């Protein structure tokens, strides 16, 4: 049941959307290219040059990118080390499955390891990897919804489950890497909702509620509210820019800036400085825009 203490704050959605629109299309693309998974996928593509490898490897890794003993950077950097150790030999589905088997032995994947192995086994044993390798690589960018719902069905998950949606973000980044444009996802594709993204919804004020209460249980009970709030932000930013800004783009921004806020122990004055510095120095965003984004995303954060 939805907790009545959590609700979408339309006024804050408007304010946050205005700030984020200042980032512009190119800014959102640069933020996507700073994602840890993009760096690894880019190296694989430049070494192997096969979109089939990117799809099978990227999606099979994405479905186990949760409950990490570390963070996403450690997860994807570890995968990169496994690939380098094998000389980036990735000429078949069997090669990729062997990589995933070795990757799951590493400490970053220690939590829920048997469950993760089961998910990877389903991915390969069900024929889904073969589907990507034999057919879907030809049209993954034009018809991503077929892959999205097919993956959810294969793993017995809802299409809006975090790891399923995150896998689609990986597909979207593969399309950007290979084609120079994003995949043709429908407007209702949700943001991959995790604790970081939910917490920033509360700290920005787009969701009314107490940030100290945030937990996986609270998120799941109020999932529709968090998804709607960020979805509304994406819609408004799209209207302001005159170009489609998917919630998957918003995710890159919010996730990266949540890590900066975390470094500042979620104290507003420090978080604002960290966020501005990151946006300006790392993402090459205008200083005034960065200041507006930092102030709006930390609006409800304690001092």
Task: Kindly give the residue locations of the regions a language model identified.
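HhH-family (HhH-GPD) DNA N-glycosylase catalytic core used in base-excision repair
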Residues: 1-303
């Amino acid at each position: 049941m939805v907790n009545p203490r959590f609700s979408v704050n339309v006024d804050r959605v408007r304010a946050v959307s205005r700030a984020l629109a200042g980032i512009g299309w190119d800014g959102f693309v640069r933020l996507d290219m700073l994602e840890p998974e993009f760096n690894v996928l880019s190296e694989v593509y430049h070494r192997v040059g096969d979109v089939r490898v990117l799809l099978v490897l990227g999606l099979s890794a994405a479905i186990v990118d949760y409950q990490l003993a570390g963070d996403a950077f450690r997860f994807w950097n570890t995968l990169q080390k496994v690939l380098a150790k094998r000389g980036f030999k990735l000429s078949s589905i069997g090669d990729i499955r062997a990589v995933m088997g070795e990757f799951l032995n590493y400490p970053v994947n220690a939590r829920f390891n048997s469950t993760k192995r089961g998910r990877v086994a389903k991915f390969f044993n069900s024929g889904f990897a073969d589907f990507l390798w034999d057919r879907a690589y030809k049209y993954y960018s034009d018809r991503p919804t077929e892959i999205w719902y097919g993956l959810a069905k294969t793993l017995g998950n809802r299409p809006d489950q975090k790891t399923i949606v995150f896998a689609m973000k990986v597909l979207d980044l593969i399309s950007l890497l290979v084609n120079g444009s994003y995949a043709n996802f429908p407007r209702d594709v949700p943001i991959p909702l995790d604790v970081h993204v939910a917490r920033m919804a509360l700290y920005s004020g787009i969701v009314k509620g107490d940030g100290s209460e945030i937990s996986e249980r609270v998120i799941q009970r109020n999932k529709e509210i968090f998804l709607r709030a960020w979805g509304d932000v994406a819609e408004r930013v799209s209207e302001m820019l005159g170009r489609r800004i998917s919630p998957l783009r918003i995710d890159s921004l919010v996730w990266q800036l949540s890590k900066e806020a975390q470094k500042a122990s979620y104290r507003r004055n420090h978080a604002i400085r960290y966020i501005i510095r990151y946006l300006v120095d790392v993402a090459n965003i205008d200083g005034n825009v960065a200041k507006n984004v930092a102030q709006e995303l930390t609006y409800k954060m304690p001092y």
